[in-house]
């Protein structure tokens, strides 16, 4: 099974604001379904049931306090001149807390053979670009200071991802609440 550790966005107002942004941005890219918007703390890839149980045990040992994040601004990976992903960002304090939580996840899973292959950059993927769409920086300029709302981070999830022609389908394998 293909799995990852995530934080979901659950606040209706934020999801509605993201949906409005996706509709108003008018770019030729595939929007992320709002029921699938999340922060990927760590992608773990294909694993078996035995390793999944070990991962669950490790994640259950993580202790963290809930915290608030404010979602604002937009950007692209690798950049807005030739993006593959369009994302929504997080204000500095919340980003630092997300980075700290991602580090806790990584430290718990490193003994199971999982290590971040690249530095965690807190973002919400809101569009995936399949074909070259060129420079969208002028379109995104209108949204660079948009505030999408604030969310309380109170749980992390181990999620299963099943790929299909219609896109990925996610299901929860484990939920770890803030303590």
Residue map of PLM features:
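Histidine-dependent nucleotide/RNA phosphoesterase domain, centered on the 2H-phosphoesterase fold
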Residues: 1-179
């Amino acid at each position: 099974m293909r799995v990852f550790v995530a934080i979901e966005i659950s606040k209706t107002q934020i999801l509605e604001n993201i949906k409005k942004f996706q509709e108003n941005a008018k770019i030729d890219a595939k929007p992320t379904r709002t029921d699938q918007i999340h922060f990927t703390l760590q992608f773990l890839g294909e694993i078996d049931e035995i390793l999944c149980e070990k991962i669950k045990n490790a994640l259950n040992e993580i202790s963290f306090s809930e915290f608030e994040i404010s979602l604002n601004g937009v950007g692209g990976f690798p950049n807005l001149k030739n993006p593959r992903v369009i994302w929504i960002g997080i204000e500095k304090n919340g980003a630092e807390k997300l980075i700290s939580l991602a580090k806790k996840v990584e430290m718990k899973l490193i003994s199971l053979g999982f290590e971040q292959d690249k530095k965690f950059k807190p973002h919400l993927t809101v569009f995936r670009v399949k074909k070259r769409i060129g420079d969208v920086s002028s379109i995104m300029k209108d949204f660079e200071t948009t505030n999408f709302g604030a969310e309380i981070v109170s749980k992390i999830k181990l999620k299963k991802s099943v790929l299909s022609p219609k896109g990925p389908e996610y299901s929860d394998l484990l939920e770890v609440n803030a303590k």
